[in-house]
A protein has these predicted regions:
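Bacterial N-terminal signal peptides that target proteins for export
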Residues: 1-9
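Bacterial N-terminal signal peptides
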Residues: 9-20
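N-terminal pro-sequences and low-complexity stem/linker regions of secreted or lumenal proteins
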Residues: 22-497
């Protein structure tokens, strides 16, 4: 009996010591501005269209699918629970994709036994637009993703990401599991929020570009729109790119090449055809402006930029082979936010200084000569966007960039942030925090990788896209941009000096 009591006491002491060690590990020591001076380079790698649950919903210690309390059961247009998930819709008119079975009303594993679609396989694209995204969130209930999606039940799919290279990197450094995309909707608006924490303006936009809303400030549906999501995706009267009061919210093209709008036949080939209604050049202050005002070096590097410039300046009759062309890099012109701003117009010194090709980014890493702040946008085939890219290729590409930085002289004073512009229409169970008219919206993955990142850590601090701008602003003592959200963190919760 004495030995049993002794063993029990030793066990209790060991348990107490282990809890003390754990407690010490999570004691927060606020990061000081002096400590931040150790970070000389900030690298932001901006992937595409993945919700947190879609890639990291099974990550140990994260707020994942097993913790979901909201939106697990999706509801129909009338608010009643769906008997099953809608079919995965493809084509016009939409029909059920025969490669997917009928799925029960709950999240499902894309690479699991029911569906057998590993993350090396492309899936179809899903709607990810301003008004639809808000309707899917449904006031924080997160239960109308399937009903509003043009891809039906696909929205509820997720992967076991444990074999991803980035997953293994997240295990070594910090994964932020409450990082939210800056704005409702798609890539165009979220890239603008990365650049300026602002929504672009389009005064006097043509009526054909303006969204048609109902009395509840939702997209107006056509009379023939299916009453039930099981009968097909919703049909809208006019799913425009501009709000009725003149803000650009869905994909609009730049007035400058590379653009999805070719040059005018009789115009300057550096510009897009003004008669086809590109977004007027914007004048809001960007994070780039704030950096330049303090003489701090920065650049936006885009995969395929030089090829796209050549492609975009061709005569309008020439076939595009790079911009939105899947047989090459599939350059996405609306993923280039600084190209929408007047300060970076063709012919300006600042354009030449700050808008650069992705190959220069990779070469600069090898040379150990990156600017203080570097944004990197992978080319279309490597950005993980559903519909034209798989997860695996982008995962390997981004992990390779991290490895290259770690091998370079840059590593010892660099902070790398890997995140995604938006959720790509995929469901996530965590409601976004209260914000403003524009966002924030769904959770997206965010990894913080640095010698100064906490190791093996899941950061539950609420962040959004503007948190990156907030960190850059604090580190380099910049004038804050007005749209940066004060209630959200500045990423220093992921750091330890």
């Amino acid at each position: 009996m004495h030995n049993k009591i002794k063993a029990l006491l030793f066990g209790l002491i060991a348990l107490w010591l282990s809890t003390q060690s754990w407690a010490e590990n999570i004691i927060e020591h606020p990061v000081t501005d002096k400590q931040l001076q150790k970070i000389q380079h900030v690298v932001v790698i901006y992937g595409e269209n993945r919700s947190f649950d879609n890639l990291y919903g099974l990550f140990p210690g994260a707020d994942g699918i097993a913790d979901a309390r909201q939106g697990v059961i999706q509801v129909d247009n009338d608010g009643s629970p769906l008997a099953r998930l809608p079919d995965v819709w493809v084509g016009k008119p939409p029909v059920a994709d025969p490669s997917y079975p009928r799925l029960p009303n709950r999240p499902f594993q894309l690479d699991g036994p029911l569906v057998h679609k590993p993350y090396s396989v492309e899936t179809r694209d899903l709607v990810h637009r301003f008004y639809q995204n808000q309707e899917q969130i449904d006031g924080g209930k997160m239960d109308k993703y399937a009903a509003v999606s043009d891809a039906g039940g696909l929205t509820m799919g997720y992967y076991d990401g444990s074999t991803m290279k980035l997953w293994k990197i997240a295990q070594k450094y910090t994964l932020a599991d409450h990082f939210f995309m800056g704005a409702f909707g798609g890539s165009f608006l979220n890239h603008m929020w990365m650049a300026c924490a602002c929504t672009p303006v389009f005064p006097h936009a043509p009526a054909a570009l303006v969204a048609s809303l109902d009395g509840n400030n939702k997209l107006a549906r056509k009379p023939a729109s299916p009453p039930s999501a099981l009968d097909g995706p919703p049909q809208f009267e006019q799913d425009g790119a501009v709000t009725p009061d003149g803000y650009g919210i869905n994909t609009l093209q730049s007035s400058y090449q590379p653009s999805g709008i070719p040059p005018a036949a009789d115009g300057d080939n550096r510009f897009s055809d003004a008669g086809k209604y590109p977004l007027p050049p914007q004048t809001e202050k960007t994070i780039g402006d704030a950096l330049s005002d303090k003489n701090i070096g920065w650049a936006w590097y885009a995969g395929g930029w030089n090829k796209a410039l050549q492609d975009g300046t061709q005569p309008p009759s020439a076939k595009r082979t790079v911009i939105y062309a899947e047989d090459d890099v599939n350059f996405q012109a609306h993923h280039q936010p600084f190209n929408y701003f007047k300060r970076y117009a063709p012919g300006t010194p600042e354009r030449a200084a700050h808008l650069k090709d992705g190959e220069e980014f990779l070469a600069s890493i090898k040379q150990g000569k990156l600017p203080s702040v570097a944004f990197y946008k992978p080319e279309g085939k490597l950005n993980q966007h559903p519909g034209y890219a798989d997860v695996a290729a982008g995962d390997a590409h981004i992990a390779g960039i991290i490895a290259a930085i770690q091998k370079s002289p840059l590593w010892h004073n660099t902070l790398i942030i890997i995140t995604y512009d938006e959720n790509g229409g995929f469901w996530d169970h965590v409601p976004p925090p209260k914000g403003d008219r524009w966002g924030p919206s769904n959770r997206v993955p965010a990894l913080i990788v640095s010698p100064y990142a906490k190791k093996g850590y899941v950061d539950h601090t609420p962040y959004d896209t503007t948190s990156i701008l907030k960190f850059i602003t604090r580190r380099f003592k910049l004038e804050p941009l007005p749209g940066i959200r004060p209630a959200l963190g500045d990423l220093t919760g992921a750091l330890q000096f």
